[in-house]
Amino acid sequence: MLTYAPLNFIAIGIGATLGAWLRWVLGLRLNGAGWPWGTLTANLVGGYLIGVMVALIASHPEWPAWIRLAAVTGFLGGLTTFSTFSAETVDMLERGVYATAAAYAGASLAGSLAMTGLGLATVRLLLR
């Protein structure tokens, strides 16, 4: 059972800070005028890592809650960003680059789902 224990708050805060910093760096390094590669990268990597974490947590029920909270709620919550993806897609639509917006939205959604499945499959294969 999850509680409002101080360790849980600290774990989420540290994880979220690290995830947000990584997303910020990816945006600075990779986002271009025509395509937000940094956001897409953050969401695809985050999708893969959430798959990995879900599989690992399922195979290790003895792990304390703060580990899941730090990794999933904190780090991956800070790394991935549905709101920035949405804003970037709407910006493309407002600029009239409809094909680019559709490609970006499709790549983000399908790619994130595929990467999550790949993360799950990776851990399941390694744990055999």
UniProtKB/Swiss-Prot annotation:
Gene Ontology cellular component list: plasma membrane
Q: How does it sit in the membrane?
A: Multi-pass membrane protein
What's an example of a GO molecular-function annotation for this chain? fluoride channel activity
Could you say which residues bind Na(+) here?
Answer: 77, 80
The compartments listed are: Cell inner membrane
Q: How does its activity get regulated?
A: Na(+) is not transported, but it plays an essential structural role and its presence is essential for fluoride channel function. The Na(+)-binding site is specific for Na(+) over most other cations including K(+) and Mg(2+). Fluoride efflux is inhibited by Li(2+).
What changing residue 82 to I does, per the record, is: Fluoride efflux is 3 orders of magnitude slower than for wild-type
More info: Renamed the Fluc family to avoid confusion with the CLC-type F(-)/H(+) antiporters.
Stored PANTHER family = FLUORIDE EXPORT PROTEIN 1-RELATED (PTHR28259:SF1)
What does the function comment of this entry state?
Fluoride-specific ion channel. Important for reducing fluoride concentration in the cell, thus reducing its toxicity. Is highly specific for fluoride ions and cannot transport chloride ions.
Q: Which family does it belong to?
A: Belongs to the fluoride channel Fluc/FEX (TC 1.A.43) family.
Name listed for the protein in its UniProt record? Fluoride-specific ion channel FluC
